[in-house]
Amino acid sequence: MIFERFDLVVVPFPFTDIHATIKRPAVVLSDPIKFGLETGQNLMAMVTRAQQSSWSSDLPIDDIEIAGLTGPSFVRLKLFNIENQLVIRRMGRLGESDIRQLKARLIEHFSLN
């Protein structure tokens, strides 16, 4: 399956033991053509409901309805690659405001400017 950048998808965690996984949301960060098709993988960021966090980079998701989430959640810059075929389903997409904020956070934390 091909997923667009900033789609929210459901993936199995952890990836190391296929017999003991839980389904968790994640945000697709990679370009579907330049990275996804070429490598068969997607670069993603974790989505969490953890409100008490020591991660200063946690970004609240404002538009939870478009994202397909059922309650308050945060994008956590805990990044990982996952094979395309392990993605269970697409659940939604970040809203435009959330996309702008996430792009700014990535630029800030990875000194991309």
Protein language model regions, located:
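C-terminal terminal-subdomain/extension
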Residues: M1, I64-N113
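Short, charged beta-turn/beta-strand-edge "cap" motif at the junction between a beta-strand
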Residues: P14-I18
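Compact nucleic-acid interaction/catalytic patches
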Residues: H19-K23, V28-P60
